[in-house]
């Protein structure tokens, strides 16, 4: 500022260098953020990032597709923002890290929406047309929400599993796994939802408590002589009685075909008021109590001795249709934790039952399977035909009681399988489905799918590490994958199946490719409208079109094929570096992707898996409508700003649950303000600084400036290490400490005197500004991945000629000679300064001084502290923010102390220091000597601070 300007304004008689900046103190985020979203889109910022990244090594985060249905929720926000932080941080680390968002478009939820709106009788072609339109509308709605959160990506060209090219490539992927020999058709119990009318994937099953009748039922002796022999008796002492089972599914009793015992468990023959009962010996006492009977054990035998004995069906006396016997099979899965140690077996409705009966020679045609796809019994089932299985439960209990077979019935609350969409109970139901075999040896004679997938888990990096064992266990123990679904809105399993034998057409692989070509042009509708004669000619008399669709988990699970190497192969590559989803995806997308890639490529489709937890409220409770504790990200963005959501996510350890509440958001907002205020200070004090014109060479900087840059460079190295390991909450914690303590509480605090009172163009001030320039470059770039709106806003003030901060890479700080020693030295000085600050505060509390500048301090120091303090010379007072500072040497640390005295001198009107030379120039009676020099002469000389 010129003197003339000072004279024209009496209040600025002795001006200081107080500068302003267009970067406002108030973020006004809800208003400004949408403007940035619009600007980023209009100016093609994502494309500019891609152009700037050309030729760098690729880093591929592959987007797990959200379902194209409904508004985005807080879980979506967590997921998309974490991905955005990863992608931006990898771009800034010098990678070419594209982000192609995607959507999962087929499947039941959309089909249900179409049924709700238009009824269930629409022709298939119309269902598909309306489903496509609905999914497109939902995608556009969600896309707006994701962009509002500051997520940058190829929003103009996302992948959609319903795009024709993706549908076609999915059919080709199906061809690949058939060619390799993993796919077979079979009758097997699968998760079945009556409301869906379809099989469900494991990932579509959730568990909720349900209350059902639990019953203990007696199967009467059919072979009393053999039974007596098994127990080492010449004959049974009485004819009445039988073997007792316990079940929580009375509806399966009409389909009973066997009984299972453990070969090594000891079973007792117990004489009771209800006849002779066979029960596991260690369960006798509990069962007698439950049945309200008294009993005497008359013989025991291991389960193996009872193998192949037969017992009458418990409803045999109620209806001739049940006059059959059940054989005893042995199974290691039988336990004595609850029940009787005897398991009743309905092979059509239980996996272990099914496997046991198969192992004992039953064929598919032997299985009794009276439950239809809608949950009702077939009309011909004796006593219960036409009833829903749930309505039949009490009637079956009554019938068992009337037949004299019921020993106990009571209500039982247990965790039970439910459909994740309908929230209704589901069952295991034997149906003819297409499966991918986990333990099938492929045609090339190589490893099984299970073996290959487990090797893939071992070869994958997990963040956090506990995810490895979780996924490993799931793969190790899972059943074969049910690939087929009985729906319309899905990618077809485009097979031609022999009408009598059920065998695939011998030209299946060739035919799948022909279908894929048509789907590529016209979508899956091409299969629906296809006349078989077009492809198989007269074979159409022998073969029919398979009507099943693929599990939607196959849609998303093959995106490594139809997206990474298909629709978006120009941008992406296989394998991906990272898949990032919620912890539920160990049984979902992570899982299905691993299986399909293991079948197609013999390896995992990803190098790393990152898992985040779910959102909970401040008390750790899940978000739910009933609790009224849900938080809408759209509402928070419009009230506080998306930046606050981004900062909350980045500052939370996502490996566990992410707690959020109004109180937590308030704390996050306060943290944001501290960072923003730091940026405002930096930008304001650089507003008259032109690097090309004013920069001071590193070796001419004041010592504290060299320290600040060396310290910031060291911090950046730590932060980049955290970014590389996807550890974002330490990044935020360290940056908040850096802004509030290292900068605001120390360096910038010390700097204010030099910035404000030194001559505007002095070396001392320009040295400080040069350091601030480097600090601002570094700070904005490490903030940008998570505080994207704020970093961009500050960047446009700092570097107005630049398009965007997101084309930058992490800052290369200038090298500071002896930086490690410098950092160590200033750590000592800051420690002493902390002691001085404490002493000053005590003096202020005792009313001995006002501000710290009214104080003169004497520091008694020893050893390295003494050396560090004295090395600063007269500049020590600036570091301590006092008007004078003296150092006295003492022998050891025990003698170290700080003395504070009030200055006896006058206060300078301009710099507020209390100095002996205030008024030394008569024409400026309120000005100190150094301010006079800084204003009217060559300015003071400063070397350290």
UniProtKB/Swiss-Prot annotation:
UniProt-annotated location(s): Cytoplasm
SUPFAM superfamilies: Anticodon-binding domain of a subclass of class I aminoacyl-tRNA synthetases, Nucleotidylyl transferase, ValRS/IleRS/LeuRS editing domain
A single MF term (Gene Ontology): zinc ion binding
Enzyme class name: ligase
Protein's name in the database: Isoleucine--tRNA ligase
Similarity comment: Belongs to the class-I aminoacyl-tRNA synthetase family. IleS type 1 subfamily.
Positions bound to Zn(2+): 908, 911, 928, 931
UniProt keyword list: Aminoacyl-tRNA synthetase, ATP-binding, Cytoplasm, Ligase, Metal-binding, Nucleotide-binding, Protein biosynthesis, Zinc
Binding partners and assembly: Monomer.
Cofactor, free-text remark: Binds 1 zinc ion per subunit.
Role summary: Catalyzes the attachment of isoleucine to tRNA(Ile). As IleRS can inadvertently accommodate and process structurally similar amino acids such as valine, to avoid such errors it has two additional distinct tRNA(Ile)-dependent editing activities. One activity is designated as 'pretransfer' editing and involves the hydrolysis of activated Val-AMP. The other activity is designated 'posttransfer' editing and involves deacylation of mischarged Val-tRNA(Ile).
Biological processes, Gene Ontology terms: isoleucyl-tRNA aminoacylation
GO cellular component: cytosol
Primary localization: cytoplasm
Organism: Burkholderia cenocepacia (strain ATCC BAA-245 / DSM 16553 / LMG 16656 / NCTC 13227 / J2315 / CF5610) (Burkholderia cepacia (strain J2315))
Listed CDD domains: Anticodon_Ia_Ile_BEm, IleRS_core
The protein's Enzyme Commission number: 6.1.1.5
Motif interval(s): 'HIGH' region: 66-76
rRNA-binding keyword on record: no
């Amino acid at each position: 500022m010129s003197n003339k300007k000072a004279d024209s304004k009496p209040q600025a008689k002795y001006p200081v260098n107080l500068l302003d900046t267009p970067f406002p103190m108030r973020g006004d985020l809800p208003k400004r953020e949408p403007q940035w979203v619009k600007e980023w889109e209009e100016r093609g910022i994502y494309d500019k990032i891609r152009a700037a990244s050309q030729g760098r090594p690729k880093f591929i985060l592959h987007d797990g597709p959200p379902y194209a249905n409904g508004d985005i929720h807080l879980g979506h926000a967590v997921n998309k923002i974490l991905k955005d932080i990863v992608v931006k941080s990898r771009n800034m680390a010098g990678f070419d890290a594209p982000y192609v968002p995607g959507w999962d478009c087929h499947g039941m939820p959309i089909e249900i929406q179409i049924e709700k709106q238009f009824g269930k009788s629409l022709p298939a072609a119309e269902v598909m047309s309306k489903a496509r339109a609905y999914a497109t509308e939902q995608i556009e709605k969600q896309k707006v929400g994701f962009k509002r959160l500051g997520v940058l990506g190829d929003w103009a060209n996302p992948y959609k599993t319903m795009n024709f090219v993706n549908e076609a490539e999915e059919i080709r992927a199906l061809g690949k796994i058939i060619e390799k020999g993993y796919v077979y058709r079979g009758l097997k119990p699968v998760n079945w939802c009556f409301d869906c009318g379809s099989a469900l994937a494991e990932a579509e099953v959730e568990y909720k408590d349900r209350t059902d009748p639990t019953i203990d039922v007696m199967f009467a002796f059919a072979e009393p002589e053999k039974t007596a022999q098994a127990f080492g008796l010449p004959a049974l002492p009485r004819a009445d009685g039988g073997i007792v089972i316990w079940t929580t599914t009375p509806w399966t009793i009409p389909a009973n075909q066997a009984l299972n015992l453990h070969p090594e468990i000891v079973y007792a023959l117990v004489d009771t008021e209800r006849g002779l009962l066979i029960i596991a010996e260690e369960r006798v006492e509990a069962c007698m109590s439950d049945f309200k009977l008294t009993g005497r054990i008359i013989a025991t035998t291991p389960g193996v001795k009872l193998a192949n004995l037969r017992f009458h069906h418990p409803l045999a006396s109620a209806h001739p249709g049940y006059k059959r016997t059940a054989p005893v099979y042995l199974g290691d899965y039988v336990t004595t934790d609850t029940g009787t140690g005897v398991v009743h077996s309905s092979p059509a409705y239980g996996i272990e039952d099914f496997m046991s009966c198969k192992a004992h020679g039953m064929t598919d045609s032997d299985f009794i399977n009276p439950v239809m796809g809608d949950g009702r019994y077939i009309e011909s089932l004796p006593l219960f035909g036409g009833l829903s299985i749930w309505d039949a439960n009490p009637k079956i209990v009554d019938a068992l009681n009337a037949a004299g077979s019921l020993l106990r019935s009571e209500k039982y609350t247990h965790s039970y399988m439910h459909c994740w969409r309908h929230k209704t109970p589901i069952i295991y139901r034997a149906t003819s489905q297409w499966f991918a075999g986990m333990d099938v040896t492929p045609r090339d004679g190589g490893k099984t799918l299970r073996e290959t997938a487990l090797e893939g888990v071992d070869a994958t990096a997990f963040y956090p590490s506990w995810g490895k064992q979780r996924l490993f266990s799931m793969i190790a123990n899972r059943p074969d994958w049910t690939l087929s679904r009985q729906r319309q809105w899905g990618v077809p399993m485009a097979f031609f199946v022999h009408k009598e034998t059920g065998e695939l057409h011998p030209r299946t692989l060739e035919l799948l490719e022909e279908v894929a070509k048509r789907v590529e042009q016209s979508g899956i509708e091409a299969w629906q409208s296809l006349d078989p004669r077009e492809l198989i000619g007269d074979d159409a008399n022998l073969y029919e079109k398979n009507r099943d669709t693929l599990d939607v988990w196959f849609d998303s699970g093959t995106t490594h094929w139809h997206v990474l190497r298909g629709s978006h192969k120009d941008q992406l590559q296989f394998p991906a570096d990272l898949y990032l989803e919620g912890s539920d995806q160990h049984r979902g997308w992570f899982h299905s992707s691993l299986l399909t890639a293991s079948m197609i490529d013999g390896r995992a489709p990803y190098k790393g898996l990152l898992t985040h937890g779910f959102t909970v409220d401040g008390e750790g409770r899940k978000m739910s409508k009933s609790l009224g504790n849900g938080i809408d990200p759209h509402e928070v963005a419009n009230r506080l700003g998306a930046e606050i959501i981004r900062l909350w996510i980045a500052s939370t350890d996502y490996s566990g649950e992410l707690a959020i509440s109004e109180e937590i958001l308030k704390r996050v907002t306060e943290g944001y303000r501290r960072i923003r205020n730091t940026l405002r200070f930096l930008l304001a004090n650089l507003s008259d600084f032109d690097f090309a014109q004013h920069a001071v060479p590193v070796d001419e900087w004041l010592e504290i400036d060299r320290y600040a840059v060396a310290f910031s460079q060291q911090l950046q190295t730590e932060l980049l290490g955290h970014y590389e390991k996807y550890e974002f909450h330490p990044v935020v914690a360290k940056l908040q400490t850096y802004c509030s303590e290292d900068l605001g509480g120390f360096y910038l605090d010390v700097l204010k005197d030099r910035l404000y009172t030194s001559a505007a163009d002095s070396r001392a001030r320009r040295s400080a500004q040069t350091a601030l320039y480097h600090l601002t470059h570094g700070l904005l770039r490490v903030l940008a991945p998570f505080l994207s709106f704020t970093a961009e806003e500050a960047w446009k003030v700092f570097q107005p000629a630049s398009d965007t901060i997101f084309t930058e890479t992490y800052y290369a700080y200038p090298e500071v000679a002896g930086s490690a020693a410098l950092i160590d030295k200033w750590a000592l000085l800051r420690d002493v300064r902390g002691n001085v600050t404490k002493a000053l505060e005590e003096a202020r509390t005792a009313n001995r001084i006002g501000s710290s500048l009214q104080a003169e301090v004497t520091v008694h120091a020893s050893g390295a502290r003494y050396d560090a303090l004295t090395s600063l010379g007269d500049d020590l007072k600036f570091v301590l923010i006092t008007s004078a500072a003296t150092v006295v040497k003492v022998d050891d640390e025990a003698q170290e102390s700080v003395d504070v005295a009030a200055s006896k001198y006058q206060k300078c009107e301009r710099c507020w220091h209390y100095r002996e030379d205030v008024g030394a120039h008569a024409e400026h009676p309120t000005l100190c000597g150094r301010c006079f020099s800084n204003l009217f002469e060559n300015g003071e000389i400063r070397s350290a601070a």
